[in-house]
Amino acid sequence: MSRLKGITGLLAALTVVLAAAGALCGAVSGLSRDASLYGTRSRETVRETMGLSSQEEVTAAIGLDAQAQEALAQQIAEGMGRADADFALEPLNAREQAHLRDVRDLMLRLGSASKVCFSLAAALAVVIAWTGARLTKRRKTLLLGVAAGLGALLALSLLLVALLRGQGFARLFAGAHELLFSNDLWLMNPETDVLIRMMPQALFERAAADAALGALRLFAAVGALLIAIEGLVGGMIRRHLAEEDKA
């Protein structure tokens, strides 16, 4: 029985980690399809970071007026969800288009990873319902497993915060690009590339915070669903076992 407790607790911890990974991947992938990131939020961030006082100044800094940028933003956001999008959009040059295709491929992989993580977490919830069905202290075992999973996530979060404080967002952001992309297309020139003028570092910092918040919300929703799955399936299994014991 003690071995079954250990297995059930370990599976509960793994379920928490999978749910969190799925939530983070899903939140980042979803944010990439938000047109406001490339449109209104872009212009607001450029205005604030450059200390501009009018939309005309923002237009001059970016090289696109609000209407043209909104149209471009809609096309970029739509393309992030389509494997066949080539991003041959005005006024983007060939390097910018190629980089957007790279980003799109990454976002699609993150979306797929999110679905896989959620599917595995749901499957584990069913397995946990089965392995924990005969445990006398099932709830305590599950809580300990969940606490272990949350503890692991907290440790990773604290490590990331420490890295951000020690290295800075810019260095970590550049390192992530070097890790995720096999080319240097992400290195852009403000003189020739509109994307870098549209999307300064501050925009990515805010987007990262938004993605983290979105991941927390999605994690909470998925967690509630997983609890419901385990409770429903576990209840059915325990009732079946009780009937067998009576027979």
Give a label for each model feature:
Residues 53-64, 87-95, 152-169:
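Hydrophobic alpha-helical transmembrane segments
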Residues 73-117, 201-216:
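Individual transmembrane alpha-helix segments
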Residues 59-81:
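Short, non-transmembrane cytosolic segments of multipass membrane proteins
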Residues 1-37:
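Hydrophobic secretory-pathway targeting helix
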Residues 184-241:
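Terminal transmembrane helical module of multi-pass membrane proteins
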Residues 166-194:
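Juxtamembrane non-transmembrane "cap" segments at the membrane-aqueous interface
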Residues 24-67:
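Aromatic-rich transmembrane-lumenal/periplasmic boundary elements in polytopic membrane proteins
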Residues 2-13, 118-169, 223-247:
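Juxtamembrane interface at the cytosolic side of transmembrane helices
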